[in-house]
Amino acid sequence: MLDIQLLRKDLDGVAKRLADRGYTLDVAAFSALEAERRAIQTRTEELQARRNSLSKQIGAMKGRGEDTSAVMAEVGGIGDEMKASAVKLDEIQARLSELMLEMPNVPHESVPVGRDETENVEVRRWGAPRQFDFDVKDHVDVGTPLGLDFETGAKLSGARFTVLRGPIARLHRALAQFMLDTHTQQHGYSETYTPYIVNPDVLYGTGQLPKFAEDMFRVEKGGAENTVTQYLISTSEISLTNTVRDSIVDASALPIKLTAHSPCFRSEAGSYGRDTRGMIRQHQFDKVEMVQIVAPEASYAALDEMVGHAEAILQTLELPYRVVALCTGDMGFSAAKTFDLEVWLPAQNTYREISSCSNTESFQARRMQARFRNAQGKPELVHTLNGSGLAVGRTLVAVLENYQNADGSVTVPVALRPYMGGVERIAAPSSAA
């Protein structure tokens, strides 16, 4: 959530910056609510001053033995008006809060201005795409003989679900373990296991609610009455970041660096017809997430570091990729600045997103009331960052396509072989060596 003082000081400036990311701030509605709020507060202060004055007057009158009934009646009327004003003020504050919760983050000044993904800016590339001397297959055709089973996934759960069997299931698990080991042993993250089901206030904290409720899977507890609806996490960013909600951490504890491997659940509302083939866009997929909670002055250095951590996974797997700075119109709701990593998929002859690393600055922290005690001993909002390190399913897709062989087998990347019992190649039973 944005700092409301920012809007009070420079409403037109904030409106312009939000317009850059495709959000139209209702300036008239905000201004009207603010004017009403100020009028009520001014009137309340006047009433308070009048009541204080009358209270002193009553004391003096009693000392002189005078009748105070008329003055006391006026004091009672003032009290009634102040109570009514307090109720009205609460209503206005609630409406302001609704407006603020719907507002996305303000883009950092370094973010390129653009309407959509076509105006993102490439920052760098790593690795040269492999030149194949045979017809390249996509991950569906490569993976199906190896245990990639969409038919059973659809039978069990419907479209956009997958069953993995045998060697391909093992390769998927190896990828997740490799990512976790790299982040914990080389990058300084603490491995964390969190619930996959969370309460609504947790989703308000990281910005999924109220705006993106249709993208979430809701769950209800069976056999219980009057229970609050809960949600399956769409990313473990949600649970990891909220571990510091409603708390004040010591400055000495920063940065807090957390990582988790979890399934993620997304309804993919609005994605009808997109990426219907294969594992690119699923309702359930695994991801290794990175989260950092840092002091404000350290957050942009932390963003660069986090991008580097995601890059290290791709480099170690020897998968070609590029880093892209997202433009204002393509950034996520909570982000002030985002870099995407896009991996090369030879069957599509293009780069596809495999990681997104974002600095939300104090946007999520304000919603969560996550603070630290600064050098002056005063509570101050932390900055929160999140990044995929990486999406496991999409990394599996990239390995299948980039490491495929003419005979239908797939070479196991060197970095994954210790997690595969030394296996160097996976193949369908009929073509296994």
Curated annotation (Swiss-Prot):
A Pfam family it matches: Seryl_tRNA_N
Protein name: Serine--tRNA ligase
HAMAP family referenced in this protein's UniProt entry, alphabetically: Ser_tRNA_synth_type1
Pathway listed: Aminoacyl-tRNA biosynthesis; selenocysteinyl-tRNA(Sec) biosynthesis; L-seryl-tRNA(Sec) from L-serine and tRNA(Sec): step 1/1
Catalytic activity: tRNA(Ser) + L-serine + ATP = L-seryl-tRNA(Ser) + AMP + diphosphate + H(+); tRNA(Sec) + L-serine + ATP = L-seryl-tRNA(Sec) + AMP + diphosphate + H(+)
SUPFAM superfamilies: Class II aaRS and biotin synthetases, tRNA-binding arm
Organism: Burkholderia thailandensis (strain ATCC 700388 / DSM 13276 / CCUG 48851 / CIP 106301 / E264)
This protein's encoding gene: serS
Binding site for L-serine: 235-237, 289, 388
Compartments (UniProt record): Cytoplasm
Keywords from the UniProt entry: Aminoacyl-tRNA synthetase, ATP-binding, Cytoplasm, Ligase, Nucleotide-binding, Protein biosynthesis
Free-text domain note: Consists of two distinct domains, a catalytic core and a N-terminal extension that is involved in tRNA binding.
Top-level taxon of the source organism: Bacteria
Residues that hold ATP according to the record: 266-268, 353-356
GO MF assignments: ATP binding; serine-tRNA ligase activity
Annotated Gene Ontology cellular component terms: cytoplasm
Role this protein plays: Catalyzes the attachment of serine to tRNA(Ser). Is also able to aminoacylate tRNA(Sec) with serine, to form the misacylated tRNA L-seryl-tRNA(Sec), which will be further converted into selenocysteinyl-tRNA(Sec).
EC number from the UniProt entry: 6.1.1.11
The keyword Electron transport appears for this protein: no
NCBIfam families noted in UniProt: serS
Quaternary state and interactors: Homodimer. The tRNA molecule binds across the dimer.
Homology family: Belongs to the class-II aminoacyl-tRNA synthetase family. Type-1 seryl-tRNA synthetase subfamily.
Gene Ontology biological process: selenocysteine biosynthetic process; seryl-tRNA aminoacylation
